[in-house]
């Protein structure tokens, strides 16, 4: 039997590998998606490490720019399309309509028990920390009048910041949906009780 998943390409089953029902076992804090966690951190760390390493080792601006920008672009794609839905059960995208207006689209799992708290923490902390790091690097380069490096830092900050903004909006939308479902359930229960008394 399949559990509900809002992500059509990712059904999850009720049974684990041993054939035992997963409901009878307590939820572990161990990551359920270690490969996703690895790649969620890998591209972020590579981009920042190469950027910092280029200050101490003469790698060259062009090579550093290419490696850091590509790592940040890969990180943007992996975070937006893979790790967000696997680690925190959220997915977002932005559609531009024919009239030129933007439309943010959000998806989230309805059953928050599917989200592992440890994985959620491993998702949010790096998203916030690396966005803040690129912002700090940008400020340092701005005041240090290092405008070539500022270009790299702004590109990386914008990529990281777009994911941060998208996931914050997505998380707010998910909370709003849960609140709306709870309110409609309560109202429905009260109305049914009132009708049954009449």
From Swiss-Prot:
InterPro entries: TVP23-like (IPR008564). Coiled coil: none annotated. Residues 1-29 are annotated as: Disordered. One of its GO terms (biological process) is protein secretion. The keyword Transmembrane helix applies. GO terms for cellular component: Golgi membrane. It is found in: Membrane. The chain crosses the membrane at residues 48-68, 132-152, 154-174. It is a multi-pass membrane protein. Residues 13-29 have a biased composition (Polar residues). Keywords: Membrane, Transmembrane, Transmembrane helix. The keyword Metal-binding does not apply. Belongs to the TVP23 family. This is Uncharacterized Golgi apparatus membrane protein-like protein 1. It comes from Dictyostelium discoideum.
């Amino acid at each position: 039997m399949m559990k509900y998943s809002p992500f059509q390409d990712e059904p999850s089953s009720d049974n684990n590998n041993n054939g035992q029902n997963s409901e009878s076992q307590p939820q572990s804090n161990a990551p359920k998606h270690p490969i996703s966690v690895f790649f969620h951190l890998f591209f972020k760390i590579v981009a920042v490490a190469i950027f910092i390493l280029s200050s101490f080792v003469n790698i060259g601006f062009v090579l550093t720019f290419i490696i850091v920008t590509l790592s940040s672009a890969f990180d943007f794609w992996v975070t937006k399309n893979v790790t967000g839905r696997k680690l925190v059960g959220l997915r977002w995208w932005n559609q531009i309509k024919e009239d030129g207006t933007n439309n943010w689209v959000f998806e989230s799992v309805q059953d928050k028990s599917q989200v592992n708290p440890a994985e959620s923490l491993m998702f949010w902390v790096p998203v916030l920390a690396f966005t803040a790091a690129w912002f700090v690097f940008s400020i340092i380069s701005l005041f240090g009048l290092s405008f070539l490096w500022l270009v790299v830092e702004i590109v990386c900050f914008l990529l990281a910041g777009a994911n941060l903004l998208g996931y914050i909006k997505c998380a707010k939308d998910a909370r709003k949906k849960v609140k709306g479902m709870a309110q409609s359930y309560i109202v429905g229960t009260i109305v049914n009780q009132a009708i049954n008394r009449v």
